């Protein structure tokens, strides 16, 4: 977890947005902070990303309740470093509140999100492969492409490749279980796509 320490080991005011992995780590921290505050979880060992975040940034516990201050700090970082607005985090709040009623629900929820995000990134990368060569400064065009791709994943039923259709069905099931909207999914994928475009390409890539 050295990358998380590198991300959180600077003064917050001087932080710069990291890569895709750093963004996904902050998403997990936010999930765990919401779960801690909503479910009254006090054992930080059960929330590894939140534990590192809290210790490295020295976030004090608010009102003797784990998760409140950490959630606020993480939301601020997602907004300032990655441009994720309040609607993005509010949808996470609503999803977790509705689907995690007890501590035992946490593991299943995180497993579902892991499957959702992995399938989503793999499929969008496949469907947008050539479009992703568009330079990063064409942000509006890339967002429109992402929006169309996510719309197809949510609504199109005539994919020719059976493997693609199988993954589409799995993503729709995950989205329904997690309660994430098409708009939330579009914004999530767009941010990951833009961060991925900034990362060094491997030698075998065109």
Locate each region found by the language model.
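Small-residue-enriched hydrophobic alpha-helices in membranes
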Residues: 2-60, 67-206
């Amino acid at each position: 977890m050295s990358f998380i320490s590198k991300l959180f080991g600077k003064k917050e005011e001087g932080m710069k947005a990291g890569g895709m992995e750093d963004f996904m780590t902050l998403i997990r921290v936010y999930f765990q902070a919401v779960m801690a505050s909503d479910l009254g979880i006090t054992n930080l060992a059960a929330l590894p990303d939140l534990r590192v975040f809290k210790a490295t940034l020295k976030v004090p516990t608010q009102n003797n309740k784990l998760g409140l201050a950490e959630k606020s700090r993480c939301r601020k970082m997602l907004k300032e470093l990655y441009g994720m607005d309040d609607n993005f985090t509010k949808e996470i709040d609503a999803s977790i509140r509705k689907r995690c009623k007890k501590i035992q629900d946490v593991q299943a929820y995180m497993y579902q999100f892991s499957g959702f995000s992995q399938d989503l990134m793999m499929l969008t990368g496949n469907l947008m492969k050539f479009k992703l060569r568009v330079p990063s400064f064409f942000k509006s065009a890339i967002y429109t492409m992402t929006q169309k791709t996510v719309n197809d994943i949510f609504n199109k039923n005539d994919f020719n490749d059976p493997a693609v259709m199988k993954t589409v069905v799995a993503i729709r099931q995950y989205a329904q279980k997690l309660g994430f909207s098409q708009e939330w999914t579009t914004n999530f994928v767009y941010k990951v796509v833009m961060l991925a475009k900034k990362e060094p390409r491997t030698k075998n890539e065109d």
